[in-house]
Amino acid sequence: MHYVYIIQSLNYPDQIYVGCTTDLKKRMSNHNSGTTSHTEKYKPWKLVVYLAFEDKAKAYVFEEYLKSGSGRAFRNKRLL
């Protein structure tokens, strides 16, 4: 399974991160331990939503969509 996930900083609620992984628990641990350079400044993080995909390509396409302008609007209106 491939997971597209959205996390939100507990200390900086305006900071949202979208990612894709096959091991959600390990990835959340990485974000909260500071081993992920892009997110270490805003830790700790909480998992807001995740979606499971069987197809890796579809997961990465959806992740890219959520990072686009219209995808951010969709995310903010429907997922957060």
Regions found by a protein language model. Name each.
Residues 1-37, 43, 47-67, 72, ...:
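GIY-YIG nuclease catalytic motif and its immediate N-terminal context
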